[in-house]
Regions:
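Acidic (Asp/Glu-rich) sequence patches and key acidic residues
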Residues: 1-104
């Protein structure tokens, strides 16, 4: 699924590929992200998961979405939700427009 993600002055079209593990963890199913706008999708992701980012020994950025919860549209704020997508983007900061990002 793809969204346009804006970070600072850059705006990129990014495709997010959600792993089977993520798909099974997301309460309510991954289908609720289909057709959602970037802010809706971000809000859904944010409501159910909290992101933990880190850098490994080789300097690679990693992001892990932890937790579970009822993923319901309209919960929390759009700003918080967009921050979740922004963190996903920042974990793959070297990605270019049209690249695909795998989310575990």
């Amino acid at each position: 699924m793809g969204w346009t993600v804006q970070v600072g002055e850059w705006e990129r079209d990014i495709t997010f590929n959600f792993s089977p593990l993520f798909r099974t963890m997301i309460a309510g199913g991954i289908r609720q992200l289909a057709g959602a706008t970037a802010d809706e999708a971000a809000t859904i992701i944010w409501h159910g998961f909290r992101s933990v980012s880190s850098t490994d020994e080789e300097g690679n950025h990693e992001i892990i979405l932890t937790g579970s919860g009822p993923l319901v549209r309209g919960q929390n704020t759009v700003e918080e939700g967009l921050n979740a997508l922004t963190e996903l983007w920042q974990a793959c900061i070297e990605a270019r427009a049209g690249d695909e990002v795998m989310v575990f």
